[in-house]
């Protein structure tokens, strides 16, 4: 039997999902900006003020990401059944408390505990639950909605990094976190409470697929998908966070390297804008493998080339691939197994991916030190991404129609 996602039912006309999308765009910008992008801006000042080393601070931040990844599995299962409104509202409240905890932390231990609380909030307010909400409410129109959401999310660093830097001057890092906590409280708590007040469509109204989650989780195709995305996440995040030292080692000034990094962010926006065309033009397996191969190729070329213009161009191309990869990840479950258990399956899929992304900066730095150069480390990352692309061939289950919106209900393989 061939099954497809149907359009949202009568309980959720187009105005309802549109309001949800606008709400999530605003709250994602705010949540990412405060919970993720403010820390790199403030880390140096925190270290100088407290004497806590930057590596220790980074470890506390990474601990929050690990907690977010692990809790995402439980969050996804709950969201499938009950919807995102109360989950994301409570997550926003926890986020406010966590940021207040960061602002007032008297010791590094308390600072780490506050990041664990922030990680708990991240699991409930960042991309995975937002993706699940839009996938259920938008049905076959999900790709456009997800693209808009990730384009908005991409503005978080553009907006909040400079705001954080401006606030940190007169207010210090503690005062800055107090202001950011207030922003979270004013924007995200009422935003999720009021903006997500829509009837949650029952799973059977969204898809008629019969894949049991336990079958899918044990299937070869799902395990291959997890491995492929985790390897690609490790490679791509290692590239992002080690791009500046790579370029500097090749003779590029820090100022130009920073520009290249920023243009890579612009590349992500271009990649996301093009995903709708890609999803209509290529089947699931083809676009998965092509995107993962793109990570490998751009990483290898960054290791190979030395000219400034070529390196900047490659940084933009690598950013485009990362932008596409975000949406390939967001639609991976629905493209293969339908939308009924999207939250649970994506939660399990995202956990190792988030862990890999959290470890990537450390892995990249250690490899560069052991191997003696960032170029050699980039070659290793390119090889890792190539393995991910090869695994991509095995990520589509038997019986899947291998198209964007149609999934054939067969036992998971």
Model-inferred region functions:
Residues 39-43, 220-273:
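Extracytoplasmic gate region of multi-pass secondary transporters
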Residues 115-151, 332, 338:
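Cytoplasmic helix-loop-helix junction between adjacent transmembrane helices
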Residues 19-54, 72-75, 161, 239-244, ...:
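Extracytoplasmic
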